[in-house]
């Protein structure tokens, strides 16, 4: 029986996605608030830097593990302000999270040119060579088979399409590393209990971050999936990193 990690626990590979779905379904309505509290608002700056990696908004963009839609809606607003003809597809395996994204899109009057698809990052329901950009923010570490998801990203991108991934990473500096580890394992789950009423969900979160490959290890995984010009940029001392690559 194939096993994989669900946080620090070993679980049957076929059960991981259901467990992850339960985590996000249970915290969907507090997801955005928790992001602000856990990151002290830094996630907004990280995401702003992330979308700057997309210079051409007259494009077909796929946002995978879209969650509550932060990345896609930032792009949609930027495109609207610049009168660009953007086509955005928001994909997430968790329907409850996509419902949050749809609600936000309606509230912000950004629903035009958006498509919503419930789908696994491992099996995307799109033809080969469909998109100019593939974005995924804080989602790839939750996928049961990351290598399979990376190959799917390569498949659905057009030639010279760009893959961009924002993910928690490995902190380099010692004093920041020590504080970050203490904050992650002691403070974040407590905030999760107080705000979302779910300590276990945020214990999973910090455990999944701790187990995620280093910047260089993930760079090799992206390259092995078939991408070229693979690189990364650390933000906030390596708390997160933006990974980018191109298809052939």
Curated annotation (Swiss-Prot):
It is an enzyme of class 2 (transferase). Pathway: Quinol/quinone metabolism; menaquinone biosynthesis; menaquinol from 1,4-dihydroxy-2-naphthoate: step 2/2; Cofactor biosynthesis; ubiquinone biosynthesis. The keyword Glycoprotein does not apply. S-adenosyl-L-methionine binds at residues 68, 92. InterPro entries: SAM-dependent_MTases_sf, UbiE/COQ5_MeTrFase, UbiE/COQ5_MeTrFase_CS. Its EC number is 2.1.1.163, 2.1.1.201. CDD domains: AdoMet_MTases. One of its GO terms (biological process) is aerobic respiration. Keywords: Menaquinone biosynthesis, Methyltransferase, S-adenosyl-L-methionine, Transferase, Ubiquinone biosynthesis. It holds the Pfam family Ubie_methyltran. One of its GO terms (molecular function) is 2-methoxy-6-polyprenyl-1,4-benzoquinol methyltransferase activity. Transmembrane segments: none annotated. It catalyses: a 2-demethylmenaquinol + S-adenosyl-L-methionine = a menaquinol + S-adenosyl-L-homocysteine + H(+); a 2-methoxy-6-(all-trans-polyprenyl)benzene-1,4-diol + S-adenosyl-L-methionine = a 5-methoxy-2-methyl-3-(all-trans-polyprenyl)benzene-1,4-diol + S-adenosyl-L-homocysteine + H(+). Methyltransferase required for the conversion of demethylmenaquinol (DMKH2) to menaquinol (MKH2) and the conversion of 2-polyprenyl-6-methoxy-1,4-benzoquinol (DDMQH2) to 2-polyprenyl-3-methyl-6-methoxy-1,4-benzoquinol (DMQH2). Belongs to the class I-like SAM-binding methyltransferase superfamily. MenG/UbiE family. This is Ubiquinone/menaquinone biosynthesis C-methyltransferase UbiE. It comes from Rickettsia rickettsii (strain Sheila Smith). The lineage of its organism: Bacteria, Pseudomonadati, Pseudomonadota, Alphaproteobacteria, Rickettsiales. The gene is ubiE.
